[in-house]
Amino acid sequence: MKKITGIILLLLAVIILAACQANYIRDVQGGTVSPSSTAELTGVETQ
């Protein structure tokens, strides 16, 4: 049972990391200097 929950947690972590990275890449490609709501949620600080 513990092995199953571990696998589920690992999958969730990977999905969340991938989503955050996709948001960050999209913000960078957009070329906007102002921080977006996604950047604030993920804790990414823009200069």
Swiss-Prot record:
Any Gene Ontology CC annotation: cell outer membrane
Position of the signal peptide: 1-19
Keyword Lipoprotein included in the entry's annotation: yes
Locations listed in the record: Cell outer membrane
Topological type in the membrane: Lipid-anchor
The entry's keywords: Cell outer membrane, Lipoprotein, Membrane, Palmitate, Plasmid, Signal
Lipidation (S-diacylglycerol cysteine): 20
Cited InterPro entries: Lysis_col
Lipidation (N-palmitoyl cysteine): 20
Keyword Cell inner membrane attached: no
GO biological process: cytolysis
Job of this protein: Lysis proteins are required for both colicin release and partial cell lysis.
Full protein name: Lysis protein for colicin E6
Species: Escherichia coli
Gene: lys
